[in-house]
């Protein structure tokens, strides 16, 4: 007697988007052509919706009974503990729970910068004696094949399982017995749940077993849930942040060496492609401010595009189309002042432009824009005037601070004893005078 996964009369499928027979339908394994095939006969070599790989990737000519397991983290091995790894299917006894996982190398796609990026592989399960390696014995060393079986299964004989006919049988969502530990860096396709990382298997097993006992008390045919962890969004977010180097807990520090590398990278670009910032200032990118380059002052010259006020100014910047079609352009050949005299001289041209950016008071942030423009237009004139009014005296090389400052000081007259406020000892004459001052005054009545 051959077994058909998901065909047990009293079985109940998990929650989700259910089709007519109560089994989830997966877009990557459903047959759109609805070609009728004979049950019990092996499906013809035909591609699934995701098997047609114009940009690389191997072909999956057979339909798996279960949804796939997708890798989302590079460098992680696909493996299960002994006796684990066979998905649960209503109507299939434990003696037939044997087979292999087949690695499907998905296609590559073209990124925005023109590079090809290969998608990480996805694994599909096939029962022993079915699928692309139906004729291979259990345990054969094959690249892209991982063999799994339950402890009750006999791996020396093929599983008595029919091939899936996509016209009548739809894929079953992959679930595992309680306590199964999924490979780290993988998630079950369509479940939004990932493998447990630090949570103990025994704890998950005890919870699952208690839940299973309650389930058996209510309904003996309820499908047990897999021992997987909650949403993997946090894990994916941490991986992305680590890949981009933007870990919020450890802000990236810019050292002198990295700042020098950033500055050199900016200066290696053509002049019209440079973007000044903290590491490469406006003056380093475009030179000093003057009549021909009259914008920028104060903090904006130090921070460049990193200045908090710059984004609102960037709203005024013309697009490439407005620059070419809305400006007066003039091509002029200029003298090449770069390079050595013994090197071959290159022809250097300047595309000079003259245009205007028009806006009115209805523009969003108009007051702020006007404030920033007034602070930065011709700001170099105010800075030069301030420097000319109070020039800082420069110290000669080799001269210590304070030395030479007393050369131009006029010599004043020496102070008196009172000004000097010096303490001296009393003489005998001084003591005699003090005693007379203490005696009472008597009027002299003697006649002359």
UniProtKB/Swiss-Prot annotation:
Region feature (RNA-binding): 52-194
Region of interest (Disordered), residue spans: 1-55, 158-231, 383-420
Biased composition (Polar residues): 29-38, 45-55, 383-393, 399-409
Post-translational modification: ADP-ribosylated. The ADP-ribosylation is retained in the virion during infection. Phosphorylated on serine and threonine residues.
Main location: virion
Sites where the protein binds RNA: 106, 122, 164
GO terms for cellular component: host cell endoplasmic reticulum-Golgi intermediate compartment; host cell Golgi apparatus; ribonucleoprotein complex; viral nucleocapsid
InterPro entries registered for this protein in UniProt: N_prot_C_CoV (IPR044344), N_prot_N_CoV (IPR044345), NCAP_bCoV (IPR043505), Nucleocap_CoV (IPR001218), Nucleocapsid_C (IPR037179), Nucleocapsid_N (IPR037195)
Superkingdom of this protein's organism: Viruses
RNA-binding in keyword set: yes
Ranges for domain CoV N NTD: 61-190
Complex formation: Homooligomer. Both monomeric and oligomeric forms interact with RNA. Interacts with protein M. Interacts with NSP3; this interaction serves to tether the genome to the newly translated replicase-transcriptase complex at a very early stage of infection.
Role this protein plays: Packages the positive strand viral genome RNA into a helical ribonucleocapsid (RNP) and plays a fundamental role during virion assembly through its interactions with the viral genome and membrane protein M. Plays an important role in enhancing the efficiency of subgenomic viral RNA transcription as well as viral replication.
UniProt protein name: Nucleoprotein
Gene that this polypeptide is encoded by: N
């Amino acid at each position: 007697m051959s077994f058909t996964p998901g065909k047990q009369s009293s079985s109940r499928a998990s929650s989700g988007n259910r089709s007519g027979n109560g089994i989830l339908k997966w877009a990557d394994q459903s047959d759109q052509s609805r070609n009728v095939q004979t049950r019990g006969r092996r499906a013809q070599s035909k591609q699934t919706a995701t098997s047609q790989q114009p940009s690389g990737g191997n072909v999956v000519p057979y339909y798996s009974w279960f949804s796939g397991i997708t890798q989302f983290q590079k460098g992680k091995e696909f493996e299960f503990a002994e006796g684990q790894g066979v998905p649960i299917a209503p109507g299939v006894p434990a003696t037939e729970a044997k087979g292999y996982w087949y690695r499907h190398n998905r296609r590559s796609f073209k990124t925005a910068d023109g590079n090809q990026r290969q998608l990480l592989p996805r694994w599909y399960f096939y029962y022993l004696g079915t699928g692309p390696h139906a004729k291979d014995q259990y345990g054969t060393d094959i690249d892209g094949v991982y063999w799994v079986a339950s402890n009750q299964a006999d791996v020396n004989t093929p599983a008595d399982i029919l091939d899936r006919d996509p016209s009548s049988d739809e894929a079953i969502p992959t679930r595992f017995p309680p306590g199964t530990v999924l490979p780290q860096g993988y998630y079950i396709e369509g479940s939004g749940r990932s493998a447990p990382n630090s949570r103990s298997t025994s704890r998950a097993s005890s919870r699952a077993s208690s839940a299973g006992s309650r389930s058996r008390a209510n309904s003996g045919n309820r499908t047990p849930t897999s021992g997987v962890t909650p949403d993997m969004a946090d894990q994916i977010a941490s991986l992305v942040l680590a890949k981009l180097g933007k870990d919020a807990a450890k802000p990236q520090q810019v050292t002198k060496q990295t700042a020098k590398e950033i500055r050199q990278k900016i200066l290696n670009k053509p002049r019209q492609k440079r973007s000044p910032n903290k590491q490469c200032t406006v003056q380093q990118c475009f030179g000093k401010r003057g009549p021909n380059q009259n914008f920028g002052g104060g903090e904006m010259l130090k921070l460049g595009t990193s200045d908090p006020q710059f984004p609102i100014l960037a709203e005024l910047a013309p697009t490439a189309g407005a620059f070419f079609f809305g400006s007066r352009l003039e091509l002029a050949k200029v003298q090449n002042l770069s390079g050595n005299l013994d090197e071959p001289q290159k022809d250097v041209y300047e595309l000079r432009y003259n245009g205007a950016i028009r806006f009115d008071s209805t523009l969003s942030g108009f007051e702020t824009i006007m404030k920033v423009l007034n602070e930065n237009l011709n700001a170099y004139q105010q800075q030069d005037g301030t420097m000319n009014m109070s020039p800082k005296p420069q110290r000669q090389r080799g001269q210590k601070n304070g030395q030479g400052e007393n050369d131009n000081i006029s010599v004043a007259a020496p102070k008196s004893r009172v000004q000097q406020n010096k303490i001296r000892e009393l003489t005998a004459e001084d003591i005699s005078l003090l005693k007379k001052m203490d005696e009472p005054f008597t009027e002299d009545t003697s006649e002359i």
